[in-house]
Amino acid sequence: KIKNTMPERYWRFVPSIRNCQLAELVFRDAEGRVLTGRLIGPDVVRGEKLFDNDPLTYTYIDQWIGIDFGVPQAVSEIFYLPRNDANGIFPGDRYELFYYRFPEGWISAGKQTASDHWLRNKTTGIEERIFTWEKGEARFW
């Protein structure tokens, strides 16, 4: 969320490091509508992937990339997604929740909408990490 919603024609994303890998960049107004415009800046050649609504594509930003809305727009929210391997949780994807019971092993609790437990993405992604709960904290192996 953005506190200052003064209408501006141009917005610029400047990474704090060179070679920033970004998958998505979305600007929204106060009603949640996606604001679109023309890409500007030295990294514009690679920028189209930022707006393709695909979390698996990404671009490298070395200097900065900006957007020209054509007319001043009041931006209320900016959503960005770093490069990822799709092992996260995405709306519309199916997940399967597991728990471990000794000596049987891992048991499926069923396919369901994601919550905040270990979930296996059944649509994309193959990496998984096993953890144990020790002294009130998750220990990843």
Model-derived features with residue positions:
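Aromatic, loop-rich ligand-recognition surfaces of beta-strand-rich domains
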Residues: 1-117, 121-141
